[in-house]
């Protein structure tokens, strides 16, 4: 019986890529800098303190690939010689450092074209597009239309939105258009329908914005605004066939998507999508789906909180806390991996919480492989995340993917 479990620790980069200078990210190192701040006692909030303690991830080879990736030692990390997994680290060949690019490349469909972006920090979405959306969606207008972080935009426009019911539109250096609306006053269903309509408008005009993101929030005063777990991403469809589509098409297999995975691939190559938000719920859902998984199944999960709650908000303590929680609970998952099963833990980009700004960082990612029948081996540097997709294709005896080289 062949089952694969693909876990993405969203934004868990391990050092700048060779082209990081193009992004202003030379020196970025999500894992390394979190470890450094913990070592310096600069990450002692949320009830955690001191050195970063993640022994189970280290037992899969994390420290070894992190040092190889960055060329620097890890402060406060005591590595182990008792490595039970195999390991590698990978460069990204996609043009961007965004969620869609990283995930599509993992699945064997790197983004070698340029996304469209709303690069102007003010009046970001052009007037003609705003008018299109307003007319077709029967709106009175938008608030914002600028570059902003999710928390800042609510501080600035949340109360005005409540009184006017005008959606809040904002973007960033990523290929995204984000729409924030109050979950009850504007309505969750109405927000989703608005984002679907924007997706259709952009697609019709051949505007390659990767994701339209619905960002519902609650609260009635600035100090009480909170984004909820009901975020939805309305993505473009992958431009190339993914390994998940091959598994379904060639083996009549199943792909169980947990959390935001289905949204990232616009539902393509997904058999079943399991709704879950928050680190604990995502982990528990993953455990349950692994227990239920049959032959020729991929269980695919993204742990988004590392990125959305801690990376973008530049919160080192929160990132460290959740890494330690994940590591503490990882043995529960490892014991469910049968002899023929394949577990891969990786990331889609970096988001160094010690870095300037609030955006992703262009970084290499770890590829931690656990298979009971495999002896521990260092598979070294990989040129593309698509080596993961090619490895899965070989594992399931599928036809060869267009990109990537099987890791083993």
UniProtKB/Swiss-Prot annotation:
GO terms for biological process: 2-deoxyribose 1-phosphate catabolic process; 5-phosphoribose 1-diphosphate biosynthetic process; metabolic compound salvage; nucleotide metabolic process. It is found in: Cytoplasm. Binds 2 manganese ions. GO terms for molecular function: magnesium ion binding; manganese ion binding; phosphopentomutase activity. The keyword Cytoplasm applies. It catalyses: 2-deoxy-alpha-D-ribose 1-phosphate = 2-deoxy-D-ribose 5-phosphate; alpha-D-ribose 1-phosphate = D-ribose 5-phosphate. InterPro entries: Alkaline_phosphatase_core_sf, DeoB, Metalloenzyme, Phosphopentomutase_DeoB_cap_sf. The keyword Metal-binding applies. Keywords: Cytoplasm, Isomerase, Manganese, Metal-binding. Mn(2+) 1 binds at residues 10, 348-349. It comes from the Bacteria. CDD domains: PPM. Mn(2+) 2 binds at residues 307, 312, 360. It is an enzyme of class 5 (isomerase). Pathway: Carbohydrate degradation; 2-deoxy-D-ribose 1-phosphate degradation; D-glyceraldehyde 3-phosphate and acetaldehyde from 2-deoxy-alpha-D-ribose 1-phosphate: step 1/2. Its EC number is 5.4.2.7. PANTHER family: PHOSPHOPENTOMUTASE. Isomerase that catalyzes the conversion of deoxy-ribose 1-phosphate (dRib-1-P) and ribose 1-phosphate (Rib-1-P) to deoxy-ribose 5-phosphate (dRib-5-P) and ribose 5-phosphate (Rib-5-P), respectively. Belongs to the phosphopentomutase family. This is Phosphopentomutase. It comes from Buchnera aphidicola subsp. Baizongia pistaciae (strain Bp). The gene is deoB.
